[in-house]
């Protein structure tokens, strides 16, 4: 009994602590939530250790995320040049963010991009062809919003250049030393994306957009993603993952609508572990995103999800729960 309690204690410590030691990738959480909490929707900045420029992984909250992150000291090492007319938030948006990687075009993943577009600088939007098509058809169309893209309806303001990524093909990321490969994910009958970024040393970081488990989605998309990541696990090159857990385990499969629970996440990660053997994911840093904000007068879903992940974490992974404004190194 005492040994079991100690095991739970050590697992809890691994969940609630994450050292800010030097790593291959630097991230800043501009938005951590899924669903209805406007101003704190899914968005992460990332850069390799060798780069000074960031790219953004989804863009649910952009300017508000930059404001909160600056207030929390996430950009304390960045100095605005004397020649710049901008605040630090403006300088970051216009000069240091060099592109957007959009996993899918649901509003909670693109709202910040759309709202900030009038004052943004020229940059690429990377995505699978279907995602970019949704952006130009549904948002940048002179009906919902002016067309800031280089394709689509009506006059094109040419601020954003749509870059259609070919699934499974590595492509360079402009104005960085990184490259990227993208793969489609299944999201309740729609398509989402996992982006795998690789730095100049061959280290990789995986960002998963919204996704359901293969078993529920009747898909093999997650298994395909794990098979691409498996060789990097074997080489010790997978430095971290950001992946969603939108709901607690109490949510029935029929109500997941293309999302994960703690149980389903660990089952999916077990597929990756099986590809390299027991213990191969020990100490892997896995950041949890997209926890849905709840209006119910009950325990915070984030607290419940933390507890439930602890209970089933027989993989030895280090679960991290970033808050808006947090800067983490992987």
Curated annotation (Swiss-Prot):
<comment type="similarity">
    <text>Belongs to the cyclic nucleotide phosphodiesterase class-II family.</text>
</comment>
<dbReference type="GO" id="GO:1902660">
    <property type="term" value="P:negative regulation of glucose mediated signaling pathway"/>
</dbReference>
<dbReference type="InterPro" id="IPR024225">
    <property type="entry name" value="cAMP-PdiesteraseII_CS"/>
</dbReference>
<keyword id="KW-0114">cAMP</keyword>
<keyword id="KW-0378">Hydrolase</keyword>
<dbReference type="GO" id="GO:0006198">
    <property type="term" value="P:cAMP catabolic process"/>
</dbReference>
<dbReference type="GO" id="GO:0042597">
    <property type="term" value="C:periplasmic space"/>
</dbReference>
<dbReference type="GO" id="GO:0047555">
    <property type="term" value="F:3',5'-cyclic-GMP phosphodiesterase activity"/>
</dbReference>
<comment type="function">
    <text>Seems to allow the organism to grow on cAMP.</text>
</comment>
<dbReference type="InterPro" id="IPR036866">
    <property type="entry name" value="RibonucZ/Hydroxyglut_hydro"/>
</dbReference>
<keyword id="KW-0732">Signal</keyword>
<dbReference type="Pfam" id="PF02112">
    <property type="entry name" value="PDEase_II"/>
</dbReference>
<keyword id="KW-0574">Periplasm</keyword>
<feature type="signal peptide">
    <location>
        <begin position="1"/>
        <end position="22"/>
    </location>
</feature>
<protein>
    <recommendedName>
        <fullName>3',5'-cyclic-nucleotide phosphodiesterase</fullName>
        <ecNumber>3.1.4.17</ecNumber>
    </recommendedName>
</protein>
<dbReference type="GO" id="GO:0004115">
    <property type="term" value="F:3',5'-cyclic-AMP phosphodiesterase activity"/>
</dbReference>
<dbReference type="InterPro" id="IPR000396">
    <property type="entry name" value="Pdiesterase2"/>
</dbReference>
